[in-house]
Amino acid sequence: MSLERDTQKSCRTGKVYLVGAGPSDVELITVKGKRLLEEAEVIVYDRLVGNGVLMWGSKNARYIDVGKRSGHHPIPQEEINQILVREARKGQNVVRLKGGDPLVFGRGGEEAAVLEKAGIPFEIVPGITSAIGVPSYLGIPVTHRDLASSVHIVTAHKKDGSLPDIHYRSLAEGGGTIVFLMGVSTLGSVMEGLLGEGMSPDMPVAVLERGTTAAQRKIVGTVGTIAGKAARAKVQSPAIILVGYVAAFRHMDWYECRPLAGRKILVTRPRERSSRLAAMLREEGA
């Protein structure tokens, strides 16, 4: 019977699910995303996926770390595409797990195109993009009736690590909130671009580092001062840059009010017995 099942499996094509894990908080993945992880036979994941999210995966699944990170891509995208096609052709159900949303600067569109061309069934499962989720965890609304009626999400990082062509004039004149992703290394150049097109040097800016984790922090300044402040604070990726009047919000920082905010606690129980305690500690901000 087992041989018959294995033969049937090898003759069918599996399916690839492009799943957004949301930001780093393990509980921000969708219910559907969690279920697919529990059912997956192969899980292909990036660095920006929080380690805790992987605990939802089956202990019998095969985990493939493709380790993409800002400024360092140890596995080329072409090879990742080949992994997805290869595993699906083995009859495996594959979860391609991505931080944030798979279609918001996550290259999910490229992977979906490869799968479609190869005749591999696929499904896209949205996730909470860091452009929205991270500001929420740091008490910043990206829209506000009196301050921002629009949101612009911009990448500040090209495939080769350089600064992309950004239409600074439309951003400087358009109003609303601007969220720059993957912009730590290009922060100074981005601010110079906005200043060069007439944005006020006093426009509030917030750099949000390691958002939705216990180690998250917010560095607040202006277009004219934030590059220096971020350098002195030694900001590192992952971080997002939020430009606009809403960046000055200070009274909604709910996360930091939790009793264990910022604390690191080591849970020494086995994985199968620690999840409930870990969830309780996370709920208190640890």
For the regions a language model picked out, list residue spans one by one:
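Class I SAM-dependent methyltransferase SAM-binding "motif I" and its flanking Rossmann-like core
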Residues: 25, 101-174, 219
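N-terminal glycine-rich anion-binding loop in soluble enzyme alpha/beta folds
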Residues: 42-74, 262-286
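A contiguous loop/helix-start segment that scaffolds small-molecule binding in enzyme catalytic cores
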Residues: 3-4, 13-16, 89-94, 150, ...
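Glycine-rich phosphate/diphosphate-binding loops that line cofactor/substrate pockets in enzymes
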Residues: 10, 36, 57-58, 84-92, ...
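Glycine-rich, flexible N-terminal cofactor/catalytic loop recognition
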Residues: 9-69, 170
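Short, acidic/turn-prone active-site loops that include or flank metal/cofactor-
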Residues: 23, 48-50, 66-73, 128-130, ...
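General beta-strand structural signal in soluble alpha/beta enzymes
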Residues: 44-46, 65, 95-99, 105, ...
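P-loop/Walker A phosphate-binding loop and immediately adjacent motor/lid segment at beta-alpha junctions
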Residues: 2-5, 51-83, 87-90, 199-204
